[in-house]
Amino acid sequence: MNVSQSAFVTREKITLKCVGIVTKPDSPEAAQFSKQLSCWLHDRDIATGINDIEEHMDLIIALGGDGTLLHIAELATKYSIPVLGVNFGSLGFLAEVNKDDTFESIEKIIAEETIIENRQMIRSRVLSKNSSSGYRFALNEVVITKNALDRLLHLSTKVNDQLLTDYRADGLIFSTPTGSTAYNLSAGGPLVYPGLATILVTPICPFMLSSRPLILPAEKLIKTKFKARDNKEAAQVLVDGQSLWKMHNGDELEIETAGHALKLIVSDSHNYFSILRNKLHWGVEDKRDK
């Protein structure tokens, strides 16, 4: 797979003729705001589509948290449509625009060049003895995991057809730098600056304490073979939190960097390290200790 060498940060003049608005499910606030936003755009002769992503759209506005943005990342990347995340959730690593700043942010997009961070995506598929699944794309991570009551998984993992190791663990997380602040971090993996081209491999509760997270170059092809103890044992594969496939004995999960990146719109004042401090409470004294 040829890894795209495009710059992490680019500037682009976006002409808005049609905008897709995607709302957080079961959020009356986001649904109501989408109507207000749609009217505002119509007043400026800009067509809109609600909760529908089409190839001809010039911009997608995700009204929700990071989960909403993850939900639309695959299609947005496929059609190379820039995404603006408006935070209606709680964390907001990716959806950094506040609701009250939405209209001002769109006016800047209309009037000026837009700053875009090209966020690396990874793609995955499951290879069985006589077939293979189609590719699916992730902005955060692909996870192979066991069922709650099952024993540890035996996962024989290769990098560019060279044996890495045989993991015995509850599962493995294959993460992008963007996803390093998500499940990877909870499992003890490292934080990685989103502009670096890497794939992170992080074991989940490994049997051997010497099994540690690993950072690989983005151009590496990773294959993990599931070695089940019997025909009843199975593993689950989740792509950005969505359960997609079940793996059986001898099946392989293939992971590699996707050929295209997600175009994530950021503000002039965007500061990755400030986001880490604020969201992870770095250097903030815990008032509960007083």
UniProtKB/Swiss-Prot annotation:
GO CC field: cytoplasm
Active site: D66
InterPro entries in the cross-refs: ATP-NAD_kinase_N (IPR017438), ATP-NAD_kinase_PpnK-typ_C (IPR017437), NAD/diacylglycerol_kinase_sf (IPR016064), NADK (IPR002504)
Top-rank lineage group of the source organism: Bacteria
Reported cofactor(s): a divalent metal cation
Annotated disulfide bonds: none
Protein name: NAD kinase
Keyword Cytoplasm: yes
Catalysed reaction, written as an equation: NAD(+) + ATP = ADP + NADP(+) + H(+)
Claim: Cell cycle is one of the keywords in the record: no
Cited HAMAP family: NAD_kinase (MF_00361)
Residue numbers binding NAD(+): 66-67, 71, 140-141, 151, 168, 170, 181-186, 242
Cited Gene3D superfamilies: Probable inorganic polyphosphate/atp-NAD kinase, domain 1, Probable inorganic polyphosphate/atp-NAD kinase, domain 2
Gene this protein is translated from: nadK
A Gene Ontology molecular function term of the record: metal ion binding
Database matches in SUPFAM superfamilies: NAD kinase/diacylglycerol kinase-like
Source species of the chain: Desulfotalea psychrophila (strain LSv54 / DSM 12343)
Any single GO BP term: NADP biosynthetic process
Function, as annotated: Involved in the regulation of the intracellular balance of NAD and NADP, and is a key enzyme in the biosynthesis of NADP. Catalyzes specifically the phosphorylation on 2'-hydroxyl of the adenosine moiety of NAD to yield NADP.
EC number: 2.7.1.23
Keywords recorded for this protein, A-Z: ATP-binding, Cytoplasm, Kinase, NAD, NADP, Nucleotide-binding, Transferase
UniProt record similarity statement: Belongs to the NAD kinase family.
Compartmental location: Cytoplasm
